[in-house]
């Protein structure tokens, strides 16, 4: 009968073998645990303290904007003009140049002279980012509804004080979760600013917001397939 081959021993860490193995030879291993890891940080001992210290970076935190490939460069971006026309919104062409927080008005060059239509609600879309160039008053109204609660805080900032004679309901701020809910919210908007949710994905230039005024007429429903 052939001799039986010895069982293969599992290669374990000397410290593990010394503390967990049932083999007496392993428990009598002269290699202590404290000698295993000191060689790792040894090259750092000769470096000055200023070299090994860590300090937070002064660079701003990078932001990642993700867009679908079909909507890249604005090729298949939704037509906001057509969307709001279906709910009875008349657009005011032009670029917003100044937002007056106290008077709830905004300035835009239109027909060779600036117009100052009254600004009431601010209507950002869900997961939208508003490009914030150096426009006076825009920093107070910049919004980012990727995180919850930002819309509510924006409403608190632009809501007029009670002494102004206007009720708190005159300046509602809401984020539209879908095109259908956007049409419902837009029924009471007169006028409002709507940020293009694909503006930062396609280009960082152009209009920072879409200024619109709603005439007094009945709104129609817009299906979700519009976007």
Swiss-Prot record:
Keyword terms of this UniProt record: Nitrogen fixation
GO process annotations (BP): nitrogen fixation
Source organism's superkingdom? Bacteria
Ribonucleoprotein listed as a keyword: no
- Residue ranges for the region (Disordered) are 19-63, 107-128, 150-227
The reply to whether DNA repair figures as a keyword in the UniProt entry is: no
**Which ranges are annotated Low complexity under compositional bias?**
48-62
Into which family does the record put it?
Answer: Belongs to the NifX/NifY family.
Annotated protein name in UniProt: Protein NifY
Underlying gene: nifY
């Amino acid at each position: 009968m052939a001799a039986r081959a010895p069982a293969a021993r599992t290669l374990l860490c000397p410290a593990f073998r010394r503390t967990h193995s049932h083999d007496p030879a392993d428990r009598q291993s002269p290699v202590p645990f404290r000698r295993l890891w000191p060689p790792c940080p040894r090259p750092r001992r000769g470096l000055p303290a200023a070299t090994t210290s860590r300090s937070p970076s002064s660079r701003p935190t990078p932001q990642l904007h993700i867009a679908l490939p079909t909507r890249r460069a604005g090729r298949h971006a939704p037509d906001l003009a057509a969307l709001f026309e279906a709910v009875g919104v008349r657009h005011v062409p032009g670029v917003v140049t100044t937002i007056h927080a106290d008077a709830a008005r905004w300035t835009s060059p239109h027909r060779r002279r600036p117009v100052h239509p009254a600004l009431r609600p601010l209507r950002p879309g869900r997961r939208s980012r508003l490009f914030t160039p150096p426009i006076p008053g825009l920093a107070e109204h910049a919004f980012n509804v990727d995180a919850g609660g930002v819309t509510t805080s924006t409403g608190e900032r632009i809501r007029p004080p009670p002494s102004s004679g206007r009720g708190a309901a005159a300046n509602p701020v809401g984020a539209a979760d879908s095109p259908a809910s956007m049409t419902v919210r837009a029924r009471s908007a007169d006028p409002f600013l709507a940020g293009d949710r694909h503006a930062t994905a396609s280009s960082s230039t152009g209009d920072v917001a879409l200024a619109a005024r709603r005439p007094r007429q009945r709104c129609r429903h817009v299906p979700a397939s519009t976007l």
